[in-house]
Amino acid sequence: NCMVAQSGGPTAAINASLAGVISGIKKSGKYDTCYGAINGILGILNDHFLNLSEIMQENPDYRERRKTTPAMYLGSCRYKLPDYLDDDSPYVYIFKQFETYQIGAFFYIGGNDSMDTIKKLSDFAILTGQKQKFLGVPKTIDNDLALTDHTPGFGSAAKYIGASTKEVIRDAQGLTYKKSMITIMEVMGRNAGWLTGGFSSLFPNQAPV
């Protein structure tokens, strides 16, 4: 069997990534059942799962509908696993769950924190001789994951910011105040500037990057 979970902030693409993971699992023919952990890694710790294989059998259009479903179908969390050298109890329980549900592969869809979680689980598996496979599926509007060019979620967020900025510009142009005005827009992106840079590309002659 295998398991998939989502974590971090929702994007317009994260459920499409879920649909892609499920499609790949089905095409591989290697797994009997695909479970979904509710609210990320907390779903494993709290024994809260969905049997996605059963849901797909009952709803043939399930995967196609997920491609355009907003928010996060499996729910999210912001829980960070401790370093296993400091406290390995969550890891021991998680791998006990994997054994109970006969999990051979775990897919985690998310951003930097989620990739940190999947790496910790992989490292612990290697350290303790476990055989499960761990795969991180990138998702972040920040576009700041290593070894990626455009992360799923970045494009839709950049498009939204560009459209919103143009609307603000039109509002400012339509005002008849005699005094000039300055509008400041704050854009998300943590320590990365990709979203701001993506917006700036709309005005190459006016917005120095």
Pin down the residues of each PLM region.
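Proline/glycine-rich low-complexity loops and linkers
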Residues: V137, I141-T148
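Structured loop/turn residues at beta-strand edges in well-structured enzyme cores
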Residues: G29, Y101, Q130
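N-terminal phosphate-binding or glycine-rich loops at protein starts, especially the Walker A/P-loop
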Residues: N1-F49
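Short glycine/serine/threonine-rich phosphate/pyrophosphate-binding segments
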Residues: T11-V21, I44-L45, P82, S89-V92, ...
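Short glycine-rich or small-residue beta-strand-to-loop segments that form or flank ligand, phosphate
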Residues: N1-T11, M72-R78, G104-G110, G136, ...
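Glycine-rich oxoanion-binding loops at beta->alpha junctions
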Residues: D47-G104, D113, I141, P152-F154, ...
